[in-house]
Amino acid sequence: MATTERKPLLLDFEKPLAELATRIDQIRQLAEENGVDVSGQIRQLEARAMQLREEIFTSLSPSQRLQVARHPRRPSTLDYIQAISDEWMELHGDRCGGDDPALVGGIGRLSGQPVVMLGHQKGRDTKDNIARNFGMPYPGGYRKAMRLMEHANKFSMPILTFIDTPGAWSGVEAEHQGQGEAIAYNLREMFCLDVPIICTVIGEGGSGGALGIGVGDRLLMFEHSVYTVATPEACAAILWKDAGKAPQAAVALKIISHDLKRLGIIDQILPEPTGGAHSDPLKAATTLKQVLLENLDELNHLTAPERRQLRYEKFRKIGVFTEVAH
């Protein structure tokens, strides 16, 4: 995971923080030029900046959390794998002639335990994003994922999946290649695997593209990630014929972690560093590793039939509601 100092990419709601940071830098520069001690004032302003950052990030709207989830510097699947694994070897190919770079995976060790890790992979710049199709896999990506999961099942290795996609690619070519079948096959087969499966939404969890690697014993979610049946922009365009109503759609869709936990769709929320995972990737990775190990320890104490039954029951409960007569 890169640690080189780079100019921050600020989101719209972070502008007050940028203004305060500029003011601190100006005061510090003037003090150095004039030999004046303003350390007390600097400390007060820095404390105010920390407080303001905390206030902003604890009161984000769903559409603002979506901006954080889509941040260009948000840690990716490969970032997390490299940060949490003792060793790692990427495996390629779906054994049908393809190797989709939008979905990566391989074998590694997590605190000495052999595991298979796989997930969606977005690019870091325009060229990389085009090569990885902006993290939207073709059917071959899901077939590659299933091949790796079958490998994990054969050799009794837990499966860790990392979800970060706007959705599966919906182009004509993908449909010709059987996009719906590839995702449906994964859904069915993941329910039948004997090994522990832990799925983590690290950024965007979009539609069937997320579900294609999202059936597990545990569904974890980073605090500022989103998980949704459709992007708010698509939902607004469909329901109101106006993509500009995406913020209202984001509220209605219940895409944020706290709503999803309350609804029983996800199992655990992973706290992020103040400012989002991109503000301190190593801290976010440390949190992820700790939570994965805790959940693996619990799941390893269950038998394969117990895991399969609980996995099935978990998903059967999603969407259950009680009608109240008026």
Swiss-Prot record:
Stretches assigned to the CoA carboxyltransferase C-terminal domain: 45-298
Pfam families in alphabetical order: ACCA
EC number: 2.1.3.15
Cellular component GO terms, alphabetical: acetyl-CoA carboxylase complex
Cross-referenced InterPro entries: Acetyl_CoA_COase_a_su, ClpP/crotonase-like_dom_sf, COA_CT_C
Major localization listed first in the record, in broad terms: cytoplasm
Keywords recorded for this protein, A-Z: ATP-binding, Cytoplasm, Fatty acid biosynthesis, Fatty acid metabolism, Lipid biosynthesis, Lipid metabolism, Nucleotide-binding, Transferase
Catalytic activity: N(6)-carboxybiotinyl-L-lysyl-[protein] + acetyl-CoA = N(6)-biotinyl-L-lysyl-[protein] + malonyl-CoA
GO biological process, one term: fatty acid biosynthetic process
EC class (word): transferase
Pathway annotation: Lipid metabolism; malonyl-CoA biosynthesis; malonyl-CoA from acetyl-CoA: step 1/1
Superkingdom of origin: Bacteria
A molecular function GO annotation: carboxyl- or carbamoyltransferase activity
Annotated SUPFAM superfamilies: ClpP/crotonase
Location in or out of the cell: Cytoplasm
UniProt key word Cytoplasm: yes
Family: Belongs to the AccA family.
UniProt subunit comment: Acetyl-CoA carboxylase is a heterohexamer composed of biotin carboxyl carrier protein (AccB), biotin carboxylase (AccC) and two subunits each of ACCase subunit alpha (AccA) and ACCase subunit beta (AccD).
Function: Component of the acetyl coenzyme A carboxylase (ACC) complex. First, biotin carboxylase catalyzes the carboxylation of biotin on its carrier protein (BCCP) and then the CO(2) group is transferred by the carboxyltransferase to acetyl-CoA to form malonyl-CoA.
PANTHER family found in the cross-reference section: ACETYL-COENZYME A CARBOXYLASE CARBOXYL TRANSFERASE SUBUNIT ALPHA, ACETYL-COENZYME A CARBOXYLASE CARBOXYL TRANSFERASE SUBUNIT ALPHA, CHLOROPLASTIC
Protein known as: Acetyl-coenzyme A carboxylase carboxyl transferase subunit alpha
Gene for this chain: accA
